[in-house]
Each structure stands twice: as C-alpha cells, then as structure tokens.
C-alpha cells in the first residue's frame, strides 16, 4: 500500500513512525504526576508524521482511542494507520483541510477523497475491497472527531457524509440466511467479490490447494532441503490444517502435557490439542477449538524439543530453555510468530527493559518456503507458487476426500469437516464441500470452489 500511495500523492512526504513499547499515561492530580495506565500497552504504536515533520495529532488522538477505549490490537492499529496515512497524503497533495466542507457535496474533502479512490480502482492501483476499507476508516475517523467535539459547530457547517440505512443478507454459523438493518453512508464503495476461478477455495483468503503430485514433490524437497523446524511447521499445516499463527504459538509444555496426560486415540492415532481461548495458542479471532495431531508428529516434535538445535535457539530467546518457550524459534532465538501472551508479558514488564521488543508475524517461515519453491522451480519441477496457508487448504480437501468415502449423503460430514478445520462459520466448510461437485476426477481432485 505505502509505495503506491506515495507515488500517487508524490507531493506529500507524510509517513508513519512507530513508537515502541508504548504505554500511555494519565495525569494524577493528587500527586501532580503522569502515571502509566494499567494494562494498556502497545508494542508498536503508530504516529503519522506530516510533510513538515510534525505529528498529526488528530490521528494520534484517534489511535489512543482505539487502543485505550476499544482495546484494539497492535495489528489493527497498524492497519488503520496505513489507511489514514493515505488520507493525509491526499490532504497534503490537494492542499485541502480536513474541515473543507463547502455547501456543494462533491467539493467536500471526503467526497473528493472518495473520487480519488474510485480513480485508483480504475487504474488498477488498489483493489475495490481496499478502497472500501480505506473509505470506511476515514469516515470512522470523522465519527470519532465529531463524537469527541474536537471541532466546533462553527467549523462544521456541513456534514462530511450522509448516513443511510440499508439491509444486508447475513448467514448464521449454521448456514441460515436472514436480513439485518445496518448503518451505511452515501460514500460507500460497492464492489462485487471476484469470482473464484480454477483451483481456488476461499477460507480467510483465496487458497490454492496442492494437487497430489504437487504435494508429493513438495514433501520430497521439504525432507531433503529444509531445516527440521521448518519441516515440522509444514507437517503441522498439512496434517492438522492449523494456520501459521496457531502453529508458531504452540509452547513446549503443550507438547509435553499431551504426551504425559493423554493416550493416543486408537481409532485415528491422534492427540487432541486445544487451541484458542485460554490455551495461549493463538487462533484467528481467538476462536477455541481442537486440533487432532497425528501421534507420529507429536513424537517428532518432542524429539526436536530435546535436540541441541532447539536448546541453542531457546537459550537465546526471552523465555530461555523452559517449557514456557515456543516450540518454533529461529536461529537467532526469535519466535516465528509473536503471540498475544508474549505481548501481555511485555506489558507486565516480565522481561528486562534492556531487551528490545520486536514483533514477528511469520515472515521467516514464508521466506523459508519461498527459498524452497525457488529451488523446485530452478530444478524444473511442475509445481505452482503457493503459500503456507495453501497447506491448510490442502489438508481440508484431503480430509474431505477421505471422509466422503464413508458416507452416502455428503451433508453428514459437514459438522466433522467444520470441527477439524476450526471454521467458526459453516459456510467456509461448505466451500470445501462444493469442490467435490465441481470436479472431474481426471486427477484425484481438481480443487475448485464456486463461492
């Protein structure tokens, strides 16, 4: 986003700075001092810097509102900042004030920003969904400024946008459809979701499951050329369907407790790992569900935890070589993915202040996969580019094929697939189910979805 926004509004030098280890304070009148707010902490707090190198204080006030009052995550704050910096660059490039709201609606600053978003959609600079989000976030920014009376009535001669009521079709977690009235605006950017073509499934993104031949090639290269930790990460994705965020926030004690307290299920030879909720293993939206992990994989992970390689990595990390540490650490002792629990631990100041905190979001794992794919392509292997999340889709389709062999009515396996995939909404599961009916079995499965 940043580079395209900068090039489109090249006159503006506005940018985002981040304040690390941010803990907001409040003025305590009794002691005439500023004290830190309890339980409010942000590892990377965004600050929008204008072209004259001054802080855009309106945005800072909004970010503090999101952090303190709405308890929004660091990731959400960064995402909002990336949208508001685009609006700031627009203001500077056009030399318009945020309160430029003349009588004619099309001249108002918000309407003109809306027009630039539509122009960029046509030029292919941004997607309709990105433009829609950006416009909505700018309007929520205005809502905050109005609600907090930051502007006087004299300054607000006209409204930045008009509110409208509309109805949307919603789907319950059970698949039932109902109509719901929602508030919208006359500046809403409408778009139709892109149709799914070829071998795609939609599950928190557009996924491309590996074909059986691609999976075979990938596993061969994974075994021959990848590090042991990256092998295990990929095996967890392929054989449990877990997301990268979940895999990389598993702690050593989770593995050891499974072995000590559980017996392997004699039907499918798996252990049960509870993720999400209070487990301190992160999931999408904190959704709590069970992962079924093959017994052989738990054994392999436990052996890895006893290895010199893991001990060396753990000794360099925050949690040291203790069971509270992550299973998966880079060579430098950093987590592949920073967990919510670690952020909370930093908030509680459990670590030395001398230790510099940095957020990790799986980039090291993605780079390892890219390196492996490049090697496969260099060797002329017939395999497409894919992501770690595509391994989850591969698990989903493999599971579907296996389960479908044991029932006459495909609807009977929907709850089972939903549970194994950890889908909060059954419609995501149905996307996988549909792939069976849009397939010609020329190869074991040509994955497709018509969502």
Language model region names:
Residues 390-423:
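C-terminal catalytic core of tyrosine-transesterase DNA break-rejoin enzymes
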Residues 59-78, 82-177, 220:
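N-terminal core-binding DNA-recognition domain of tyrosine recombinases/integrases
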Residues 421-446:
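Catalytic-site neighborhood detector that most strongly recognizes the C-terminal catalytic loop/helix
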Residues 155-214:
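Flexible interdomain linker/hinge and immediately adjacent N-terminus
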Residues 212-244, 413:
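Basic, Lys/Arg- and aromatic-enriched nucleic-acid-binding interface segment
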Residues 147-152, 237-266:
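Short, charged phosphate-coordinating catalytic segments
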Residues 250-300, 307-325, 334:
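Conserved tyrosine-mediated DNA breakage-rejoining catalytic core shared by Y-recombinases
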Residues 294-383:
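Active-site/catalytic core of tyrosine-dependent DNA strand-transfer enzymes
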